[in-house]
């Protein structure tokens, strides 16, 4: 086992705070409408230019192991806030730095770290309650656009496109962000349920212009096994042919004789059929087939529930107004499923989302909710260079998370004003002893830090602006973009309540851990082995020229 280097007490805390300051100073430069850019070196290709706090934090590793531990703990604040609320990483870092710096000073002055932590926790609890009281629900598109604009570093085009996407696919709909091919941002909306499987044979194409198979008012057969024997399909095919409607078959696989017969029937015009593979794999495939069954009002033909394909009738099939099948995608539009059944299924999936700990599973479950609840919107980000594209895409993703958070818990006045207004509730608190009361004072000062930093980045005097904001009430604050004072809501400067709350809670959590740290352990630096001595020349080689 490698030897360890151990630091105690004041020495440990000083090094840790030094690391915190290095990371926080780099990150907080990006805060506010006049935040500065940070340039990140890449191992290959051009450097990345960003105003995204979490991107800066992720890049930072310090040479000193003890300083690096401090930096990594604050990085955790940024990424945890990003995971919870999707934004607010820079605010969380600024709050954490302020709490840790003041807390470390108090511990150095001989105060009890545990009492300081209790005081900070008490203050944060009161501030969170006050934030919820100030919060207003987000209902209209304008507020959603404003939140998106602020989160995207005051880019109105991003705020507007997100609001439009939410309007089209609903609050539950999935909105994905992709790199576009043009200079402008574009919005593509897929209505209904789309999955990434196309037709199994090009002979199913009936729309030569779009190279797709379009079915109007079709029946939909859902089967969780392979279909290779055409005899199994005959009862369903006969029923569909009598009804004079087209048929979409979604199965694990359609092959051999069965596929050949379907192609021949389609070409001859006896019955219009399109066969596609079921999406997903394993349990996820079964779940998605069940989703389709609920959406279309059909039944999944599965031997697990005692249904054999040869016994299936037209009553077991789902219906939809339209189905479009391209080479790569299938879209079911306006399924005939019962609304109550769809809502119940959505509720069931939402419960699974709450229970899962895997980010990947959560994302896939959210996609399923969206496909059942309304549709999928794709924002294609446009830019003139690859560097700009990456930076803009990161901002769009941030703004999207922020708007979702705003819809979830409402909004508060932005620009650091909400935390300043929450000071009133915290200022009335008293601790059980002097050290706890000092902990409350530390939290009070830290809650002013985001506004101070926004003002400093805009090139103004933080104390002067802060005092003027404190003299006002309600939504009154400072618009750093144009240097005006006024109603932040009217200016359209809003922050999601969830973002501000998460930033404060996560910052206090890490600050509490750091203040109460008494020892740090890291691997001792390895001493370089002495190099081998140079070898002598071979005998008998004297006088030779090389």
Curated annotation (Swiss-Prot):
Name the PROSITE patterns on file: CHAPERONINS_CPN60
What keywords are assigned to this protein?
ATP-binding, Chaperone, Cytoplasm, Isomerase, Nucleotide-binding
Which Gene3D superfamilies did the record assign? Answer: GroEL, GroEL-like equatorial domain, TCP-1-like chaperonin intermediate domain
Q: What is its EC number?
A: 5.6.1.7
Record has Chaperone as a keyword: yes
Q: Which domain of life is it from?
A: Bacteria
Main location as per UniProt: cytoplasm
Q: Where does ATP bind?
A: 30-33, 51, 87-91, 415, 479-481, 495
Task: Name the chain's protein.
Answer: Chaperonin GroEL
């Amino acid at each position: 086992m490698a030897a360890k280097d151990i630091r105690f007490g004041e020495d440990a805390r000083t090094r840790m705070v030094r690391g915190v300051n290095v990371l926080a100073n780099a990150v907080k430069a990006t805060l506010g409408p006049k935040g500065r850019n940070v340039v990140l070196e890449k191992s290959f290709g051009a450097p990345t230019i960003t105003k995204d706090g979490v991107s800066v934090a992720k890049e930072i590793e310090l040479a000193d192991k003890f300083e690096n531990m401090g930096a990594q703990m604050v990085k955790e604040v940024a990424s945890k806030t990003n995971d919870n609320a999707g934004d607010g990483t820079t605010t969380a870092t600024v709050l954490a730095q302020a709490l840790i710096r003041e807390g470390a000073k108090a511990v150095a002055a001989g105060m009890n770290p545990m009492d300081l932590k209790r005081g900070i926790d008490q203050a944060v609890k009161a501030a969170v309650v006050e934030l919820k009281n100030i919060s207003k629900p987000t209902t209209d598109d304008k507020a959603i656009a404003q939140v998106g604009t602020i989160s995207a570093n005051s880019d109105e085009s991003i705020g507007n496109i997100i609001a439009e996407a939410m309007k089209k696919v609903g609050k539950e709909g999935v909105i994905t962000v992709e790199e576009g091919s043009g200079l402008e941002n574009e919005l593509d909306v897929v209505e209904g349920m789309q999955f990434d499987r196309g037709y199994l044979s090009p002979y199913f194409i009936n729309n030569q212009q779009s190279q797709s198979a379009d079915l109007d008012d079709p029946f939909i057969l859902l089967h969780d096994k392979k279909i290779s024997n055409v005899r199994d399909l005959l009862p369903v095919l006969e029923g569909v042919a009598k009804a004079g409607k087209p048929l979409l078959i979604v199965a694990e696989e359609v092959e051999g004789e069965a596929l050949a017969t379907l192609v021949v029937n389609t070409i001859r015009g006896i019955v219009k059929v399109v066969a596609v593979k079921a999406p997903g794999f394993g349990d996820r495939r079964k779940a998605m087939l069940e989703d389709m069954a609920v959406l279309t009002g059909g039944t999944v033909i599965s031997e697990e529930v005692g249904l054999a394909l040869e016994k299936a009738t037209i009553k077991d099939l789902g219906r939809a107004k339209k189905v479009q099948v391209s080479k790569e995608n299938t879209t079911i539009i306006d399924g005939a499923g019962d609304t109550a059944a769809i809502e119940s299924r959505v509720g069931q999936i939402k419960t699974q989302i709450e229970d899962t700990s895997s980010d990947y599973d959560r994302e896939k479950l959210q996609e399923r909710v969206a496909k059942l609840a309304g549709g999928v919107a794709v924002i294609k980000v446009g830019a003139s260079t690859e560097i700009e594209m990456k930076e803009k895409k990161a901002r769009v993703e941030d703004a999207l998370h922020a708007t979702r958070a705003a819809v979830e818990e409402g909004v508060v006045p932005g620009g650091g004003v909400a935390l300043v207004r929450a000071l009133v509730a915290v200022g009335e608190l008293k601790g059980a002893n002097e050290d706890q009361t000092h902990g409350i004072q530390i939290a009070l000062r830290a809650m002013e830090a985001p506004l101070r930093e926004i003002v400093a980045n805009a090139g103004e005097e933080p104390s002067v602006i802060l005092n003027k904001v404190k003299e006002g009430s309600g939504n009154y604050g400072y618009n750093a973009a144009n240097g005006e004072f006024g109603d932040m809501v009217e200016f359209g400067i809003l922050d999601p309540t969830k973002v501000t709350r998460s930033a404060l809670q996560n910052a206090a959590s890490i600050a509490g851990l750091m203040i109460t740290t008494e020892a740090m352990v890291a691997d001792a630096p390895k001493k370089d082995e002495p190099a081998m001595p140079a070898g002598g020349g071979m005998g008998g080689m004297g006088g030779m020229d090389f």
